């Protein structure tokens, strides 16, 4: 049984924000791939040039946790990492901080899920990201994460005006 710490409101802890770079556009599937320091995210096609920077926001309510690699799911964005922290909020909610490497995102789960999955800091798990928001316009290319290689497959193309 979990010891329940004092209550806190979940509102100020619901979003993570970081910079990503447009890696490629897949016009056939209407998806854009974004690169950030700890992986890639696929989002609906955005009208930004390849290599441009964007600000990404991920709401904790859009992040689920899996203990094993999720294979047969419709969620496209699945990233490995580990639970860094659990913060008990107003019942029944718990904010799970998920460490992807250099990037941290949050998942808003219930206490029941924490108990059922036996979530504890340090536990390796998968973040399943259901939605990603792009905030504002394209950013300067200075200080953007640099992918190891730029892809050149047939689906890589600039967004058509």
What are the residue ranges of the model-derived segments?
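Internal alpha/beta loop-helix hairpins
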Residues: 1-40, 66
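Well-ordered beta-strand positions
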Residues: 23-26, 87, 99
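Short aromatic-glycine-enriched beta-strand elements
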Residues: 28-33, 90-97
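Short solvent-exposed strand/turn elements
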Residues: 34-42, 96-105
């Amino acid at each position: 049984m979990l010891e329940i710490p004092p209550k806190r409101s979940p509102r100020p802890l619901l979003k993570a924000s970081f910079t990503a770079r447009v890696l490629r556009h897949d016009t056939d599937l209407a998806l854009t791939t974004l690169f950030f320091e700890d992986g890639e995210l696929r989002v609906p096609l955005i009208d930004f040039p390849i290599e441009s920077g964007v600000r990404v926001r991920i709401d904790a309510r859009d992040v689920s946790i899996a203990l094993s690699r999720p294979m047969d799911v419709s969620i496209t964005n699945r990233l490995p990492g580990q639970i860094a922290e659990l913060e008990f909020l107003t019942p029944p909610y718990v904010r799970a901080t998920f460490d992807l490497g250099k990037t941290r995102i949050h998942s808003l789960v219930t206490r029941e899920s924490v108990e059922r999955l036996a979530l504890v800091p340090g536990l390796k798990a998968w973040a399943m990201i259901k939605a990603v928001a792009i905030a504002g316009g394209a950013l300067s290319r200075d200080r953007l994460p640099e992918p190891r290689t730029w892809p050149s497959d047939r689906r890589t193309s600039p967004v058509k005006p």
